[in-house]
Amino acid sequence: NAGTWTIEANGADIWAAADAFRFTYQETDGDFDLSARIVSFTDVHEWSKVGLMARQSLDAGSPNVFVNLTGTHGVKVIHRDTVGGPTGPDPAEPNAEAPVYLRLVREGDLFTSYLSDDGAAWDLAEIAGAPAEVTLALGDPVFVGVGVTSHIAGTLMTAEIDSVQGSFLPVEPLGKVAATWAALKASR
């Protein structure tokens, strides 16, 4: 748990063939389990997004999996299977709103998305027939972290996230954190 993260971002969207957003990430290999609570965010657009993402690269058209909370459409699980390919599917869970816990788990090529009200009891993020499990061969290393987009290029939004926990965060003896988080503002 790294306290509360306040992330300001703009960007056109995380969708279609290329993404424009802010990404706070950790590079890692192998399986992982990442969770966080989306405390709040300023939804400047109905499709503003904040959530947990795994990407093959930092390129705008990278294959990725993204479980996210939207401005007014609730939680979505979306993915892009190929470089520069389409992003989908489109269904959302409209009853979800901040604060909400999101979780993204990788086991080999299987990515599973969850949501929770309390961070203890997790439900699969199966939304309107769209699966919570996505099989995607991203390889190693992958970039894992928090993605935020306002959905309006040039217009900032602010997201507050806490309770960030990841099984891939290596810790050195004596409590020194060996992981380095980075932020990237990707744009088309």
Question: What are these language model-derived features?
Answer:
Residues 187-188:
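Residue-level hotspots within well-ordered secondary structure
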Residues 1-182:
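Extracellular glycan-recognition regions
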